[in-house]
Amino acid sequence: MKICTVRIERRLLRYRSPIPTAHGPVGDRWTVLLALEDENGHTGLGEAAPLAGFTPDSVDDAEAALHRWASDDSSGGLPDGSPTARAAVDSALLDLAAQVAGTSVHRLLAPDSPDRLAVAALATGATPDDVAASAAEAAASGHVTIKIKVGVGEVDADRDRVAAVRERVGTDVRIRLDANGAWSASEAQRGLERLAVYDPEFVEEPVAGLEALAALRLTSPVSIAVDESAGSPKEVARAVSMGAADVVVLKPSALGGPSASAEVAARVRDAGLDVVVTSLLEGSVGIRAAAHLASAIGALDPLPGLATASLLDEDIAAPCRPIGGMLYLGTDGVGPATD
C-alpha cells in the first residue's frame, strides 16, 4: 500500500447547543480532517480533535504535527508532539488498510467482532426538567444507558438533576455520572453519598488527580471511573497501579488512536478493571474509529459513550448517529453504515 496523496484540512464542528462540563461549556470548535489516498483510489480518513481540559495539544499543534508527518518521507510512523494527530494518522491508516483488505476496521482487527453495538447517550439541559426530558427522549429511542453531567453547580442541584432523570426513565435504564473532576474531596464524598440512592452505574472523575481519586475510592459508595486524569497510556498504567479507579475510560482520540488504545485496554483488563470507550465530542470520523475499536476489543459492557454525533448540527462527515440506541458499523473501512 503506497500513500500517494495526503490532505489536511480544518473543519468546523457546530453543536446544537453548548455542552456543559466542569471545564466550561463545549461549543463550536475546529477539528482537523486527514485524508490518505493510495495508488488504487482508496481513501482513509482520520480526525484530530483536541479539546481543552482533555488533551494537552491545541488544534494548531495537531495541524502542525500532521503537516510535519506528511512532509517527512522517511517517517513511516506516527506524528510526534500531538496525541490527537497520532490518533488521526493511526485511524486513517487502519481505514485504508481495511479498505485494501476488503473489510471493515473492526473485522480487520478482530474477525469475529460484531457489526453493531449499543451505546450510551448523553442527557443535556439547563434545568432538571430539561435534563430529564433529554434522558426520557433518549430512553424512548432505545438507549438503555444515559450519562448525566454533574459538578457544574452545587451538589444539591446535581441531586435534583439525577433524581429527575431517575424518576423519568425508571429503574431499567442505567445512569452514569460525569463530574469532570469538579468536586473537592469533601464535596465528592457528600455528593456521592446523596446520589448513591439513584443507583448510578459509576461516576467519572468525581475529583481531579489520581491521588485524590485513589483516596476517594476507599470510601465512595459509587464505583469510580478515571478519565481525563489518565489521559495518556503512561497515566492509565499509573492509575491502575495506584488503585485509582474501578473503570477506565478510554478516548482513542486523546490516547493516540485505536492501536494505542487497544494496547492500553488489554493492560487494564489484565489488572481486572473494566474499560469504557468514549468519544472526545469530536466529529463522526473520530466517533466511527472509536466504535470500530470498541467492537474489535469487545468493550461492549459497560456501554461505549459514542452517541455524541447526535449533539452536532454540523458534522465533518456522514453523521454516525445511533438508531434505536445502536450504532451499525459498515463493511468498508470505517463505514458509514449507520445514519
Language model features with spans:
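N-terminal capping/lid subdomain adjacent to the active-site entrance of alpha/beta enzymes
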Residues: 1-175, 180-189, 193-196, 316-339
